[in-house]
Curated annotation (Swiss-Prot):
One of its GO terms (biological process) is ER-dependent peroxisome organization. Residues 66-81 are annotated as: Required for peroxisomal location. Pfam families: Pex16 (PF08610). Coiled coil: none annotated. Residues 1-84, 132-336 are cytoplasmic. Keywords: Membrane, Peroxisome, Peroxisome biogenesis, Transmembrane, Transmembrane helix. This is Peroxisomal membrane protein PEX16. It is a multi-pass membrane protein. It is found in: Peroxisome membrane.
Length: 336
């Protein structure tokens, strides 16, 4: 136990001292997941495991950096724990589905899917009703912007002070003097004022409390939270080939969005979340049974047409054509 504690402390020290190298490690792990996909049998499961690990690594490192920078989430400790558990579930849900299907078959797969969706719904309802978290965004915890937030870790740069710079007489460009440039790993490749404005905007956005929801908005958010459970229940009643689950889920999503149509008083992050949900309605084109009966043939034909007539497109289109059928069958990819 003592060795594990020392190893943990050393890792935390490394992350706080080398945020740029940590970000490169996260990117390398995520890139490895893409390289593994389709290389051998069981490669999809291994690829998803590595991808889930990369997301958990980002979540862990962000927590370490926030603690070092004293940039705690603007929520209570209990709410922060719920958000963390919700984030962990979203990181591992696809791998858990694929692993359950591999080990326990279809029955185990659907059982794991139902348990994960139930756990996520309970956590989100607690956040909505008990903690008054408002419109819940995805991801639940905003990733830390390493480029701007990691600046205070550099001892030779103080973002709170005015940074000496030179203004060109003809071009009027603002150029940082070499003497006052931060070290390479924490340098921001933009005008000094741009970095300060960006930091201020992000800090204000993170510290802004969620918009209080009225009865109509609370019902809308509750519908959005309950939609996965309603869809799973309808699948159990009518089966995967029936149109009823697809139509019911679509009606619930559109009703939720229509009840949240008044966006004037929402924060920027909440408006972006509603825009994301609106765009995700396009996923219904890729969800069964609509995909099986209408979309699949047309999408594959279009990709093949682009591959045959536009040079270079095949490098992206062919792997996409190979992977799309597998992707569409994974519940948390298409319905999660």
């Amino acid at each position: 136990m003592e060795k594990l504690r020392l190893l943990s402390l050393r890792y935390q020290e490394y992350v706080t001292r080398h945020p740029a190298a940590t970000a490169q490690l996260e990117t390398a792990v995520r890139g490895l997941s893409y390289l593994l996909a389709g290389r051998f049998s069981d490669s999809h499961e291994l690829s998803e495991l590595v991808y889930s690990a990369s997301n958990l690594l980002v979540l862990l490192n962000d927590g370490i950096l926030r603690k070092e920078l004293r940039k705690k989430l603007p929520v209570s400790l209990s709410q922060q724990k719920l958000l963390t558990w919700l984030s962990v579930l979203e990181c591992v849900e696809v791998f858990m589905e694929m692993g359950a299907a591999k080990v326990w078959g279809e029955v185990g797969r659907w059982l794991v899917i139902a348990l994960i969706q139930l756990a996520k719904a309970v956590l989100r309802m607690l956040l909505l009703i008990w903690f008054k978290a408002g419109i819940q965004t995805s991801p639940p915890i905003v990733p830390l912007d390493r480029e701007t937030q990691a600046q205070p870790l550099d001892g030779d740069h103080n973002p709170g002070s005015q940074e000496p710079s030179y203004v060109g007489k003809r071009s009027h460009r603002v150029v940082r003097t070499l003497q006052n440039s931060p070290s390479l790993h924490s340098r921001y490749w933009g005008a000094p004022q741009q970095r300060e404005i960006r930091q201020k905007q992000q800090q204000e956005e993170l510290s802004t409390p969620p918009t209080p929801l009225g009865l109509q908005e609370t019902i809308a958010e509750s519908l959005y939270i309950a939609r996965p459970l309603l869809h799973l229940l309808s699948l159990g009643l009518w089966g995967q080939r029936s149109w009823t689950p697809w139509l019911l889920s679509g009606v619930v999503d559109m009703t939720s969005l229509s009840l949240l149509s008044d966006r004037k008083n929402l924060t920027r992050r909440e408006r972006l979340e509603l825009r994301r949900r609106t765009i995700l309605l396009l996923y219904y084109l890729l969800r069964s049974p609509f995909y099986d009966r209408f979309s699949e043939a047309k999408i594959l034909f279009l990709l093949q047409l682009l591959t045959d007539h536009i040079p270079g497109v095949g490098l992206v289109a062919r792997p996409l054509m190979d992977y799309l059928p597998s992707w569409q069958k994974i519940y948390f990819y298409s319905w999660g």
